[in-house]
């Protein structure tokens, strides 16, 4: 069997057992994009407007829903409508990290009711495998997917070594099929288990075309480094795309800022897809 990195998204989708991961791979192939935009804004309308601006260029929109100061269920309704209109999936970056019973409640209930609208979410393995079973109890019947945080892009992150190995091991032990991949900086599944035949997605943050860091510990690599060199599947880009909204000029002229957001979305989509085509030998 050839390395997963040499297979097309379409061929991988055909063999993918997790419904959310299958839908994501199909979307990536259909739209010719491996771009996920991380929208870390604190205003409901800005979140929706960024989705509108980047929707045609992305396969996935990543939210931190708990930072939205004027959150209501209408936001969820409109976000879901935009995902259908522009054909992308939603990833709530919740980073669950508690015992099974607690995370199942955090996932299904509370103010945000994440499981009802987010196709994919993620978790730290620090509490042990019960974090997987607790979330699977809620998410698997809904066809959702879970990513384990095997590695992080911030300087000094402790997600390495034995911890990363444990994430890979638990993903392969998961009999529910709910775990569908990792947040990681490289192809950790093949690196840690050379003979694995299970296809687990690798979504990678810390991607930028113009800067190498942010002064707060974030470290950036290019789409080519992430997709072609490291063999990852999805690039996660945040401020490199929506950053125009945070400048004084952007705050003063939002129309121009959102035009820039759209332009950057197109730029990263092209860079990510070109890197993928080179990886599988089609360019």
From Swiss-Prot:
Q: Name the catalytic site residues.
A: 95
**Gene Ontology cellular-component annotations:** cytosol
Where are its TM segments located? Answer: none
- The residues that hold substrate are 40, 62-64, 93-102, 220, 239
Q: What pathway or pathways are given for this protein in its record?
A: Pyrimidine metabolism; UMP biosynthesis via de novo pathway; UMP from orotate: step 2/2
Provide the family line.
Belongs to the OMP decarboxylase family.
The name this protein goes by in its record: Orotidine 5'-phosphate decarboxylase
Which species expresses this protein natively?
Answer: Mycosarcoma maydis (Corn smut fungus)
Q: What is the lineage of its organism?
A: Eukaryota, Fungi, Dikarya, Basidiomycota, Ustilaginomycotina
Q: Which gene encodes it?
A: PYR6
């Amino acid at each position: 069997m050839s390395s997963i990195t040499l297979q097309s998204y379409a061929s991988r989708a055909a063999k993918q057992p997790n419904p959310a991961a299958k839908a994501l791979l199909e979307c990536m192939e259909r739209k010719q994009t491996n771009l996920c935009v991380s929208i870390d804004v604190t205003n409901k309308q800005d979140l929706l407007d960024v989705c509108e601006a980047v929707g045609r260029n992305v396969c996935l929109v990543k939210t931190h829903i708990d930072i939205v100061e004027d959150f209501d269920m209408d936001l969820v309704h409109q976000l879901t409508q935009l995902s259908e209109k522009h054909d992308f999936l939603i990833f709530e970056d919740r980073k669950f990290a508690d015992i099974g019973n607690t995370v199942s409640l955090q996932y299904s209930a509370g103010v945000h009711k994440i499981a009802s609208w987010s196709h994919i979410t993620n978790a730290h393995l620090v509490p042990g495998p019960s974090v997987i079973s607790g979330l699977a109890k809620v998410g698997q019947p809904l066809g959702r997917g879970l990513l384990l945080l095997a590695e992080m892009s911030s300087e000094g992150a402790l997600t390495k070594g034995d911890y990363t190995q444990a994430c890979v091991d638990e993903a392969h032990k998961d009999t529910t099929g709910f775990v569908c991949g990792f947040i990681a900086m490289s192809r950790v599944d093949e690196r840690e288990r050379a003979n694995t035949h299970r296809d687990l997605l690798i979504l990678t943050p810390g991607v930028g075309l113009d800067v190498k860091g942010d002064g707060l510990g974030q470290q950036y690599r290019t789409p080519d480094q992430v997709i072609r060199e490291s063999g990852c599947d999805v690039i996660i880009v945040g401020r490199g795309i929506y950053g125009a909204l945070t400048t004084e000029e952007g705050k003063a002229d939002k129309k121009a800022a959102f035009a820039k957001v759209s332009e950057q979305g197109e730029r990263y989509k092209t860079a990510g897809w070109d890197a993928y085509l080179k990886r599988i030998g089609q360019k």
